[in-house]
Each structure stands twice: as C-alpha cells, then as structure tokens.
Design a protein with these regions (language model features):
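Cytosolic covalent-transfer regions centered on His/Cys nucleophiles
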Residues: 1-162
Length: 162
C-alpha cells in the first residue's frame, strides 16, 4: 500500500528549483545560493532576497541546528512576506560541516521559507520531506543524479507505508 502524496507537498516540490552543484564552504553561503535560486526561478521577488536571507540566518543562529543526521540539512524559517511555502533544493557533493549530531557533513540541502499564517502546512511539508530523505536509497539516488528532474521525481515518488 502506498501513501497518497499531499497535494501541497506535490505542488511545492514541482515548483522548487534544484541546484546540483553547490560548492560553498559556509552554510550561510549555501542558504544564499538557494535563496538566489528561488529568485532566479521566479519563486521569490528579488526585493525579498535580503529579508529572506536575514530570517533564515536568524533561525540558524537563534533557533538551533537545522542539520539533521545522514547528510541532510533543512535550513528553514517563517517568512512573513509569503502567503505559502517556497522551497529550493541543493546538492553539495563534497559535503559541508553544518554541525549535525552524527558528525556527517551535509550533502542534501532543502531550504524552506514558510508563511507564519500556514503553520500546519509548514509542519506537514517538513514531515513529508523528512520521510523521504530518511530512506537511504532516496538519498543515494539524489546524490547520484545528473538532472534536477531526476531529483524531483525521487522526491515525488510515493513511499510505502511501514
């Protein structure tokens, strides 16, 4: 039996820019690169770029670690200028030390900007993306992908209930 994809999750992933060649040496620079990807994709107004970065950076500094185990980092914040959720996905093949508890460098980044008016959607999205990224085979295929659409397909693929 397969889990039905959340329509919100599906639409968020379908519109997310995906960067396969992150090479920054600081996590703040990765966040800026992914915010710039949102701007370039038309998913974030250029005039909101600096404010989005300031909010993500504040969340990283004040709100604790967004680096998860297994090479995953999900920098995220509530961003009042938005009415919905905007996401950018990035792959850093060398990995970057983001302070994960397991000590592994982060290689898969999912930047999430959410409206404070949509707290349930924010939690649902984080839960849904985490369910997929917890699967070793999905992480492995993302790291091997040569095409953003291959990453998108992996993140949209229904996962089996356990």
């Amino acid at each position: 039996m397969y889990q039905t994809l959340c329509v919100e999750y599906d639409e968020i992933i379908r519109t997310a820019p995906i960067v396969l060649n992150l090479n920054e040496t600081l996590k703040v620079d990765v966040a800026m690169h992914l915010i710039d990807a949102l701007v370039e994709a038309g998913r974030l107004a250029p005039e909101l770029r600096n404010a989005a970065f300031a909010d993500v950076h504040a969340r990283e500094v004040l709100g604790g670690c967004t680096a998860l185990a297994n090479g995953i980092s999900i920098p995220h914040c509530r961003f009042a200028a938005l009415e919905d959720i905007r996401v950018a996905i990035g792959v850093h093949h060398d990995g970057l030390d983001c302070g994960a508890m397991d000590g592994m460098p982060s290689r898969i980044f999912v930047l999430v900007l959410s409206s404070p008016k949509q707290p349930k959607a924010h939690i649902r999205f984080l839960s849904e993306i985490n369910r997929r990224l917890l699967l070793p085979e999905i992480r492995e295929h993302i790291l091997l992908a040569n095409d953003p659409e291959a990453v998108r397909a992996l993140l949209l693929k229904p996962i089996e209930e356990s």
